[in-house]
Design a protein with these regions (language model features):
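Conserved functional hotspot residues at active sites or interaction interfaces
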Residues: 1-209
Length: 209
């Protein structure tokens, strides 16, 4: 991978990912991009912290490291930390959030598969918080969020509120462990990406350690 500050002609936004806070700041994110040999593209963020070109070789995969400083770190704030994947051919991708004892991976939907209405499905018991986020792939995206449980930003359960985002912007919301966010609803005027997780989830509820 190399630093590269201009998109190649023909590159299309293929997918998007965000990192959610893990157990500590020692967590590291990894983006794995799969495609045909010779596929080229770039991985970018609006804030400029991530800007790398890639070429997929005979292995069929390219890898980009994403430091935890690029993860969404402030609940309720609009942030420019999303990782956008552009490529000149179709690709698939996964995002790994790696930390000892608490690693998870998300398969990333193609931008064409993203929708305008979602329900959150998440596990309510964790070491710290239960989290969900939304990321826009178009300017002027307005999402109406109806949380299933009370959020730590002060938003009460069942009362809708709007989030306004431009392309590459994200907002994350959190709840205390034990608060059920499953069923939280998103109704959006444009397609966006939604992610949900527990910060060091406890399964079963009372771990044996």
């Amino acid at each position: 991978l190399k630093a590269d500050y201009g998109l190649e002609g023909g590159s299309t936004l293929r997918t998007v990912a965000v990192g959610h806070p893990n157990y500590t700041s020692g967590a590291v994110g990894y983006m794995f991009i799969f495609g045909a040999q010779g596929t080229t593209g770039q991985v970018l963020s609006n804030d400029g912290a991530i800007n790398h070109g890639f070429t997929i070789d005979a292995s069929g995969v390219a890898e980009v490291m994403v430091p935890s400083s690029q993860f969404l770190n402030t609940a309720g704030a609009v942030l420019d930390k999303a990782v956008l994947v552009y490529a000149n051919k179709a690709v698939s991708a996964s995002f790994l959030n790696r930390e000892q004892y608490t690693t998870d991976m998300s398969y990333l939907l193609d931008t064409g598969a993203l929708g305008t209405e979602y329900r959150v499905l998440t596990w309510p018991y964790s070491y710290s918080t239960v989290q969900f986020s939304l990321t826009a792939i178009e300017d002027g995206t307005v999402a109406t969020v109806t949380p299933a449980g009370a959020l730590l930003t002060g938003r009460p359960a069942s009362i809708p509120f709007d989030v306004i985002l431009n392309k590459g912007q994200s907002a994350m919301y959190t709840a205390s462990s034990g608060i059920e966010l499953t069923g939280t609803r998103f109704q959006d005027n444009k397609p966006l990406a939604v992610f949900a997780r527990g910060q060091f989830a406890h399964a079963p509820v009372t771990p044996g350690y």
